[in-house]
């Protein structure tokens, strides 16, 4: 499934953030790759208000709000990460992960799929495990999804 189809599907099933910013600037040369413009095309018919990027944001063919439509491999689930670990390493690794993710509650949201890890977060966590000597660690679940972090 290509990026645009994934975005359409996200709107169809309501899997888009409520704070998305739409763009309706037809003459923009980057519109076919911009998540703001494509979101305006695929939004639900019931959506009749929201934040927008105004046409005057486009200057000399460039827009400072341009954000590319990007599909990323999201991850969640930590049980596999800790499966082969020495008991003595687990508490300190969990503590460092909680610190990185923001809190104990956030840690469990990522563990239980309420939140999903971006590739950058996955990389950091794998590097954290590597510092303890665990090189081939994997998360339990993955899915290809639209990156809504730059909206």
Predicted features and spans:
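DNA-binding alpha-helical recognition surfaces that contact promoter or target DNA
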Residues: 36, 109, 127
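Recognition helix of helix-turn-helix/homeodomain-like DNA-binding domains
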Residues: 103-118
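Short C-terminal boundary/hinge segments that cap the last helix of small helical domains
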Residues: 132-151
